[in-house]
Design a protein with these regions (language model features):
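Sec-dependent bacterial lipoprotein signal peptides
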Residues: 1-18
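Short loop/turn and low-complexity linker motifs enriched in small/turn-promoting residues
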Residues: 16-141
Length: 141
């Protein structure tokens, strides 16, 4: 009985956690959901955002925000690259307000400042777990 109880607790704690997509399984965000920052910039940098598999809200898109404007609508297992000008950028994630289902009715607004230099590359993951909910973190090489 204790073993069953321990297994139940473990499944509840890890049940909504996401996991990193294997590089060969990452899909690009389709062009119709890439809304800005797609033109190459000679003196800019690149931001790559990927979304883990599984987790809470797996059936919903998440809005990727650059300088507080929607740059893409990203699904699970997808990745997008953004070409951004040099300077301090604000990278964030939020609710996909283009979605008129329950997915677009929640609350999510996380931002972080990012210093972009010419030729720099920055990578981030959108993750989920039972404690933090949905969040974005830099990819550790």
């Amino acid at each position: 009985m204790r073993l069953i109880g321990a297994a139940l607790v473990l499944s509840l704690v890890t049940g909504c956690s996401s996991w990193k997509v294997a590089p060969e399984d990452i899909r690009p965000v389709p062009a119709d959901r890439l809304l800005s920052h797609q033109q190459p910039l000679a003196t800019g940098g690149q931001i790559t955002v990927s979304r883990d598999l599984g987790g809470m809200g797996a059936g919903c898109y998440i809005a990727v925000l650059i300088d507080r404007k929607v740059a893409a609508r990203i699904g699970v297992g997808e990745e997008a690259q953004f070409q951004v000008p040099v300077g301090t950028r604000v990278l964030g994630i939020g609710i996909d307000k283009a979605d008129d289902t329950l997915c677009g009715k929640g609350r999510l607004n996380l931002e972080q400042a990012l210093s972009v230099e010419a030729g720099s590359q920055h990578a981030f993951r959108i993750r989920t777990d039972n404690i933090k909910g949905v969040y974005i973190t830099p990819v550790e090489e």
